[in-house]
């Protein structure tokens, strides 16, 4: 059996999105400061260099070899 909040919460979210948000959003967008919506000034955060990362995510210094031989 499904719990009551699992049914009620999605229905309330759908009602808010469909009927209430079109009326509330224009009012809030005038009051809310524009700075809170914009991205931060640090543009280096979006640049990622993956050349030195191995398959496990750790940086590698040189070529690695995978040995198929079992070591005892």
UniProtKB/Swiss-Prot annotation:
Undergoes ER-associated degradation (ERAD). It comes from the Eukaryota. Residues 1-33 are annotated as: Necessary for its localzation to the endoplasmic reticulum and lipid droplets. Keywords: Endoplasmic reticulum, Lipid droplet. The keyword Endoplasmic reticulum applies. It is found in: Endoplasmic reticulum; Lipid droplet. The keyword Cytoplasm does not apply. Pfam families: DUF4512. Its main location: endoplasmic reticulum. GO terms for cellular component: endoplasmic reticulum; lipid droplet. Residues 36-72 are annotated as: Disordered. Interacts with DERL1 and AMFR. May activate the NF-kappa-B signaling pathway. Belongs to the UPF0729 family. This is UPF0729 protein C18orf32 homolog.
């Amino acid at each position: 059996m499904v719990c009551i909040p699992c049914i009620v919460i999605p229905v309330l979210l759908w009602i808010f999105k469909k009927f209430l948000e079109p009326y509330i959003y224009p009012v809030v967008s005038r009051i809310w400061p524009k700075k809170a919506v914009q991205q931060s000034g640090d543009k280096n955060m979006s640049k990622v260099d993956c050349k030195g990362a191995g398959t496990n995510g750790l940086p590698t210094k040189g070529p690695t070899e995978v040995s198929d031989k079992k070591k005892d």
